[in-house]
Every structure is written in C-alpha cells, then in structure tokens.
Amino acid sequence: MKPRPPAPLESQHLPSETKGVPAWAPFTHRTFTIIWLATVVSNIGAWMYNVATGWLMVSLDANPLTVSMVQVSNTLPMFLFAIPAGALVDIINQRRFLIAGETAYTVASMAFAVLVWLHLMGPASLLILSFLVSVGSAFTAPAWQAIVTQLVPKPELQAAVAANSVGINISRAVGPALGGLLVVSFGLGAPFWINAVSNIGVVAALFWWRPPIKPVVPLPAESFSSGVRTGLRHARYNPYLAATLIRTIGFFFFASSYWALLPVVANRQIGGGAALYGVLLGAIGAAAVGTAFVLRGLKSRLGANWLVAVASVMTGVATALFAVAHGPLTAIAASLLAGASWIFAVSSLNVSAQVSLPDWVRGRGLAMYVTVMFGALTAGSALWGQLATSWGVPTALFIAGAGAVLAVPMTWRWKLQLGEQVDFSPSLQWPAPVTTHAVEPDRGPVLVTIEYKINPNEREAFLDALANASNG
C-alpha cells in the first residue's frame, strides 16, 4: 500500500481465482478503505516533501552531484535496511512493526520541518535528515507489501493490488504539483509540515486496525539472524527471483538518471522554478495513472518480458529528451514518456517478484527485491550526478539513455515469471515406510534399532557397559 517505494504489487496476472472480481470489491471492506485513504493522503504529503527537498538543495547548492545526493539519501536506506526489515516482517507482529516505523517517520519529518522553518538547514544537514526520514520508509516497505493479504480475501487480492497502485499513482500525479504550488505560494517550509501532519492519519489507522487472528503454530520462533540467512539463501537458489532481480537492475540503474537530475534540468537547463519542477514530477505521475488504464491489454498482448523491454527503450528516449530540453514543452513530453515507461516496468517486475516467492519467505524475498531496486537507484543516482558534474547534464543523460536501451539485449536471457506455472505448495508425496509386517493403527510390531560406532581400543569397555545397561 504505502509509501515511497514504487507500487508494491501491481498486475493483472495473479492466480486465476482472482479473475472476474470487480475493481471496487476491496472497498467493501472498511479496514481496507480506511487504510487506503490514509496512505493516499500520506503519499501526497510525501511527494510534496520530495519536491521541496530537491528544490531546497538547488537553492542551497546547485552543483549536479550535490543535487543528485538528495536522491541517494532518499534511496540508500532502502538498500541498507530492506533485508533486515523483511526478516523482521516474517518473524514479528506486522501491525506493531508498521506502527513503530511510521511513528519514527512522522517524528523525523517533524524535525525536518522545524529546521527548515528556523532556517537552520544546510546541504549536509539536509542530506542527513533526508536519510533519517527515509529509514522509516525502508523498515516499513516490506511490511506494507506483506499485509495486503490480511486486508482482503484472497480472491480479491488482484483488485486490492490494482486499487493500491491507483492510489499511489494518484498521489504521484497530485502531490508534486501541489508541492511546487506550495513552495511558490507559502515558501519552502510548507510542504515539510504537510508531509509530517499527513502521516499522522496512517499511524492512527494502524492503531485502529485489528488484523485477523492467525492460528497458533506450535513451533519455535525463527531468530533474526537465522531469518536473514534463510532469506538470502532462498534468493540465491530461486531462479525465478534471480531473473527478476537482474532485470530490475537493468531498468532502475539507468532510470535513476532523470530522477536524480530533474531539479537541475528544471532550474539550470530550462530556467524554471519550483512550480515547473513540480509540474514535471506531476506529469510523470499523471502518465502513470493514464497508462494504468491500458496496462491490462498491453500485458496480455506483449507479456511481462517484452513490456519491460519496451519500458527500457522508452526510458532511453525520455532521458534523451530531457538532455535536449530547453523549454517546458519538451521536458513535459519527456516526463509523460518516463511515467508511462516507469509503470510498465514496475508493474511487471513487482508481480514477478511476488509470484516467485512462497509465503513462508515472502517478506524476506520482497525485501531482497526492494534492496536490489533501491541499490540500483542509489548507485545510478550517484554515478549520473558525478558524470553531470564532470561532463555536463546533457552528456550524463545521453549516456544513461543509451545504457537503458543496451540493457535490453544484455538482460534478455533472464525471463520474468508471472507465476501461472510456479507451484510453491508443500509436497505431500513422501515415500511410504518399508515394513516387514502389516502395521495396524492400534497394534503391530515396532522395531527400533540403534547403531554405535566404537573405537576398537574401547570395545571391551563398551560391551561391559552395554551388558550392565541390559541387565539393569
């Protein structure tokens, strides 16, 4: 559901039992509706915050590398903490975990707003606080993905996922434009306060929510360190997840370029203000919302593998348009193309990750996917910022665009899995034990044998001890 990572689950290719469920079915469940509304409001505040942080850094230090570090500080926590967070999600109470993480996010956001309001924010403190705010998102992201099945019945899962995606894309379309308008009208501090206040509704909704009681399993709880090791081991030997991760790197590493450098493009290359920056981000979100209406048909015609390939080529074209944009219209066209390509890739990769995982390791597997995604975004943002500082913004964007196109043939051998033929249910086909006589349920011969391996030098002592035991 929530927040800052791309839509957690998004596709029309979930198991066949979800087919035919109305799109509005999840909203017949009060819990889903309340949490959905709270997260949409919070995500609008988060996108206002994203606009404000990028523009605040431009006003403090317009160096492309420094500006791109804002994107790095926002994505690095997800890379560092998603795997341990995923292990915790599979072990501890998910509701309490979300309450703690969202409360920490709210407190950090309020601290950010206070420092901006008091004019105490500099480039270094902005990056540090951006990192701390994003830590809350990093720890809660796997949990938000994992609780969807607790909010609606399984046949309605696909509709719930689609509703979540619509909510996230609505916030992406509305939030940046409102953020830019707030900066122009009320100053840079306003979006930070709204972001902090908007998340209070999420915390309240989580306190109110009472998840269904699960049957108690009489097994010892898995330890945190063991959970992390098990998740990493599963990811290593799951070929379906491995293919998803490789394709994820191939897309997000190059797509990170325009996210990292868009404030510089809007300010230095086009000569616009915060309002233009908000419009460009809003155009990306609006394109994602519009594309969602044709996504089902495109997936059925092209399939996930081709859809991600098309998304990579579209990203290359969009990045090249950003490189040559010297007016708002070209930049807006690039944003629309980038938004459509983003939703093509994210929808296919998210679902491929979901259906490639069994339930018992789902939180950790999704955390691995999130880690790889944000690792690619983090590394890419830093690289494109450095190249833009050394060779210029247009050159860096052209290189990123060419890389996005070349990534298609380089990663094509790894096919995405949409899960129709993947069965993760436990096998019950165990071989029957070999018996010398028929065994009745209430009687029958039972023979237990115990073998001992004894040092030949201690043979006599062992026989004496065995004789004493049998006589005792």
What are the residue ranges of the model-derived segments?
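C-terminal transmembrane bundle of multi-pass solute transporters/carriers
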Residues: K2-L9, V70, L80-I83, I91, ...
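Juxtamembrane intracellular "pre-TM" segments in multi-pass secondary transporters
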Residues: E10-T33, P212-I246
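Substrate-agnostic recognition of the 12-TM MFS/MFS-like secondary transporter fold
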Residues: T31-N50, Q71-V89, N93-A108, S125-V184, ...
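MFS-fold secondary transporters
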Residues: Y49, V58, A111-V116, V133, ...
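Small-residue hotspots at the loop-to-helix junctions and early N-terminal turns
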Residues: Y49-A52, L56, D61-Q71, A162, ...
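Transmembrane alpha-helix termini and helix-breaking/packing motifs in multi-pass membrane transporters
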Residues: G54-D61, F112-L118, V174-I194, V264, ...
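Helix-loop junctions on the cytosolic side of multi-pass membrane transporters
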Residues: A146, Q150, F192, A196-E222, ...
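Short amphipathic alpha-helical segments
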Residues: N457-G472
